Amino acid sequence: MEIRAAEISKVIKDQIANFGTDATVTEIGSVLSVGDGIARVHGLDNVQAGEMVEFANGVKGMALNLEADNVGIVIFGSDAAIKEGDQVKRTGTIVDVPVGKGLLGRVVDGLGNPIDGKGPIKADKRMRVEVKAPGIIPRTSVHEPVQTGLKALDALVPVGRGQRELIIGDRQTGKTAVAIDTFINQKAANAGDDESKKLYCIYVAVGQKRSTVAQIVRQLEENGAMEYSIVVAATASEPAPLQFLAPYTGCTMGEFFRDNGMHAVIVYDDLSKQAVAYRQMSLLLRRPPGREAYPGDVFYLHSRLLERAAKMNSDNGSGSLTALPIIETQAGDVSAYIPTNVISITDGQIFLETNLFNAGIRPAINVGLSVSRVGSAAQTKAMKKVSGSIKLELAQYREMEAFAQFGSDLDASTQKLLGRGARLTQLLKQPQFQPMPFEEQTASIFAGTNGYLDTVATTDVSRYEAAMLAYLRSDHPQVLAAIRDSKDLGDDTKKALVAALDAFAKIFA
């Protein structure tokens, strides 16, 4: 075989001339120590705070502590396969997640990866998990109602689009049930084509049991609500960093709707567990502890999340993101650190009480302590007209109830007040998964506040309400339609409703 030097030199010259200069340069560090989901890494001198990094085995992490000689990284996965000396490389990207309508009907983890076995997600784009909340100028005041379908809420503690309304109570008081009923109640609005009426739903499960999350997904599917909902699940068995990140992930998905002129409601279930996960991470990163061993910035953890819920003005698309954060109290103690923090951040709170729940008053809302700081601005005109007096009557009832326990001989007016209060309390009860359209709520509360229940036995109130609404649907559908279409209780509609209720009173027995 003859060696042709000229040919070989030509090939070498061609190789040199066509050599690709686009070599990829990645900054690589090495693990100094690892344990409890935290890695200390040396050599990542230019890493950004909040940047994603990748370990040798493919597990991702996020740089949280930038110190003089090393970087504290929280690991989004198991640290079992990571050992001292392993390589860690920068990705150059801040944590981002897929967003868009392609996520509706799906269950994803804290990083937006699908965990429901329905294949990859068709996302419109990816957005950063940590962004600044909208400023003051792009916002407008809350003025459109979120119809929860729960009489006690829509009448007494109204929630508006763009509001932050805290749901707070002990374990097993029905906090999640309030949120799920709100989701189910959006079915009729989301079935239409009017994008301004639709309300997309996002449920973020933080530190919940997997069985609980599976049950919630099943309930949403059975009630036809999953098709317009997204579930973000960082369950109790997930690492603390994912439980910390999940609410921000869900919020980013909700912001896609808010910033594109659509409306969304997001439930964080619950932020107590997120704070616990963040406390765990902070202590392991050796940040100084404060009250109840939470780090000093635990208020900022929740405020920067909840400030992203907003109602945008018409120049910015008129979209909205409504937040319903949930906080679990211990033995009804709302003066603990995290509950007081979140109460001060939100625009009102819904108190759920164990003794009301056990007494059969469900939803177990303490009407006296619950408040909406947006108030009647978030109600339809019809609901505003009928619910004004119910608040006063229930307040008087609660005040009198305390005195009535001492004295037996009460005058007629006090007895009447106590009787009506007891009937109104019965009227506000509602079974789970049965949200009520607002026109039917209006008719119910109108009947309660205008004396139609005064002759009905307290035990028969629920039966009266069901029969009365069935009668209106069958014999007077035009009354309900008028309330639904005008969202008001005009004089003509009111006369027709009074006539219908008078006619029903004669046949109810």
UniProtKB/Swiss-Prot annotation:
InterPro entries: ATP_synth_asu-like_sf, ATP_synth_asu_C, ATP_synth_asu_C_sf, ATP_synth_F1_a_nt-bd_dom, ATP_synth_F1_asu, ATPase_a/bsu_AS, ATPase_F1/V1/A1_a/bsu_N, ATPase_F1/V1/A1_a/bsu_N_sf
Site (Required for activity): 370
CDD domains in the cross-refs: ATP-synt_F1_alpha_C (cd18113), ATP-synt_F1_alpha_N (cd18116), F1-ATPase_alpha_CD (cd01132)
Keyword Ion transport (UniProt): yes
Binding site for ATP: 169-176
Keywords of the record: ATP synthesis, ATP-binding, Cell inner membrane, Cell membrane, CF(1), Hydrogen ion transport, Ion transport, Membrane, Nucleotide-binding, Translocase, Transport
GO cellular component term, pick one: plasma membrane
Top-level taxon of the source organism: Bacteria
Claim: Cell cycle is one of the keywords in the record: no
Catalytic reaction annotation: ATP + H2O + 4 H(+)(in) = ADP + phosphate + 5 H(+)(out)
Compartments it resides in: Cell inner membrane
Primary localisation category: membrane
One Pfam family named in its UniProt record: ATP-synt_ab_C
EC annotation from Swiss-Prot or TrEMBL: 7.1.2.2
SUPFAM superfamilies according to UniProt: C-terminal domain of alpha and beta subunits of F1 ATP synthase, N-terminal domain of alpha and beta subunits of F1 ATP synthase, P-loop containing nucleoside triphosphate hydrolases
GO MF assignments: ADP binding; ATP binding; proton-transporting ATP synthase activity, rotational mechanism
Family classification: Belongs to the ATPase alpha/beta chains family.
Job of this protein: Produces ATP from ADP in the presence of a proton gradient across the membrane. The alpha chain is a regulatory subunit.
Protein name in UniProt: ATP synthase subunit alpha
Originating organism: Sphingopyxis alaskensis (strain DSM 13593 / LMG 18877 / RB2256) (Sphingomonas alaskensis)
